[in-house]
Amino acid sequence: MAAWEFALGLLTASLWRWARKWRSPVKVKPMLAAVSSLEPQLEQITTDLRDRDRLLEDLPVSFLLLDADNLVLEANRSARVLLALPPEDYCRPLLEVVRSYELDRLVARCRAANAPQTDRWTLTPVNPDPLQVVPQTPRPVQGQAIPLSNGQIGVLIEDRQELVDLAQQRNRWVSDVAHELKTPLTSIRLLAEALRDRLQDEPQVWVDRLLGETQRLGQLVQDLLELSRLEQGPSGLQKLEAVDLVALLTSVRNSLEPLAEPLRLGWAYQGPEQGFVRGDRQRLFRLWLNLVDNAIRHSPSGGCLYVELRQRGDTWICDLYDDGPGFADADLPYLFERFYRGDPSRVRPAAASSSSPGSGLGLAIARQVVEAHQGRISARNHPVTGGAWLRVQLPQEPSLTPALKIGTGRRSG
C-alpha cells in the first residue's frame, strides 16, 4: 500500500528535477496538478486494498492465493492454523507448503476447466517442526478453487470437522434410541400375536392392525440400525466376495414379482450376462431391492422398468429407470436424505393408500450401501421416458473377467 504513495512522491520529485535541469518550456505545474489529482483516488484504492486484506485475514474459512506457477502468494490466519503453516513468507510451490495431493488435483482441474471446482477430502496437515514426531489430526475438509486474472487461483478450504462431529453424535443418538425401542416392540408384537389367537371376529381386526403397525415400527428400527452400521464405511460391511450383479438383479426381480405382477409391469434388461463386483452380497441385494421396490411403487400400470448394465474402465455402471412421472425438481437435492418423502403426486393411488408406507429410509440406505462399496449413486429424470432414473457405479471385481455377451433388451412381463 505504501508503494503507491512512494511512487507518487518519486514521480513528483522527478518532474521538478527534470524541469529545473533542462529549464524546459513545458509547463510543469499542470503536470504536477494532474499527478496531485490522483492522490484521492490512490488513497481510496489503498483503503480498499487494506479492507480487502483485513477481510481475507479474518475470514473463518481458509484462503490461499496461488500464482500462475502454483506458488503460494498469500495465506490467511485460518489457513495457517488449519494447514499448520509457519508464519513466514511463502512463495513456494503449493505441494511444498501444503502436502495435499487432493488439493493439488483440485487446482489442476480448476486450471484445466477455467471454472470453479469443488471437492471434499480428508486433510492430514504436516507438522511444521520436523523434530516433532507427533502426527497431526486428519480433518474432513471441503475445498473450492476459483480462477482469477493473470493465471492466479484463489482457494477456499472449509473445515467440516464440526459438521462431521454433529452428524456422528446424531447417528449415535439414533442408534441408541433404536436399540432401546427394539426390545419393547418385540414384546408388544408377541403379546399382540398371543391376543389375536384368543380373539375372534371384530376385535381380531383391531389386533391385526396393531400387529401391522408394530411390524412397521420394528422395520423402521431395523432400518435405523442398518444405517448406523453402514455409516461406518467399508468396515460396516460383512463378508466380502465376488458378487454377480446380473444374478443379483434377477433375484431382486423374482422377489418383487408379486408386487409388480398385478400392475402388469414389464422388465427390460440390456447388458452382459455377468458383471462381478467385490462386496457384501446381502447389502448389495438390499440396495437393489430398495431401488427396484421404489421404482415399482411409482410406476403406472402397464409400464416398464428398464435396467442397463455396462462397463466403463474398471467400473460397472447400472442404470435403472421407469416411465412414471419422474422426480420433482425440488426433490432431487434431498432424495437420499433420511426420512425425506418426495412429491406425493408421484405415488400411484394404490401405493399411496397402502397400510404400510415406506419409512423414508430406503434411498438413504441405498446411498450408504453404495458409498460403503466405494461407489457412487445419482438420481435424475430420464431424457427419453421422463421417468425416475437412478445410476449406480461400483468398482469391478479385479480378479474376474466378465462375459461380454450383450442382452437383447427385450421386455418381459
Curated annotation (Swiss-Prot):
The record's section on InterPro entries has: 2-comp_sensor_kinase, HATPase_C_sf, His_kinase_dom, HisK_dim/P_dom, HisK_dim/P_sf, PAS, PAS_fold, Sig_transdc_His_kin-like_C
The EC number(s) given in the record are 2.7.13.3
Xref: PROSITE patterns: HIS_KIN
> What molecular functions are annotated in GO for this chain?
ATP binding; phosphoprotein phosphatase activity; phosphorelay sensor kinase activity
Residue ranges annotated for the Histidine kinase domain, each copy included: 176-398
Q: Which residues carry this modification: Phosphohistidine?
A: H179
**Broadest EC class?**
transferase
- What catalytic activity does the UniProt entry give for this protein? ATP + protein L-histidine = ADP + protein N-phospho-L-histidine
List UniProt keywords, sorted A-Z: ATP-binding, Cytoplasm, Kinase, Nucleotide-binding, Phosphoprotein, Transferase, Two-component regulatory system
Q: Which GO terms describe its biological process?
A: cellular response to phosphate starvation; regulation of DNA-templated transcription
Q: Where in the cell is it found?
A: Cytoplasm
GO cellular component annotations of the record? cytoplasm; plasma membrane
The membrane-spanning stretches of this chain are none
Q: Which SUPFAM superfamilies does this entry report, sorted A to Z?
A: ATPase domain of HSP90 chaperone/DNA topoisomerase II/histidine kinase, Homodimeric domain of signal transducing histidine kinase
Pfam families according to UniProt = HATPase_c, HisKA, PAS
For this chain, the annotated S-S bridges are none
Q: What is its main location?
A: cytoplasm
This chain's function reads:
Member of the two-component regulatory system SphR/SphS. Sensory kinase. Is involved in inducible production of alkaline phosphatase in response to phosphate limitation as it is directly involved in the regulation of phoA transcription in response to phosphate limitation. SphS functions as a protein kinase that phosphorylates SphR.
Question: Mind telling me what this protein is named?
Answer: Sensor protein SphS
As recorded in Swiss-Prot or TrEMBL, the protein's gene is named sphS
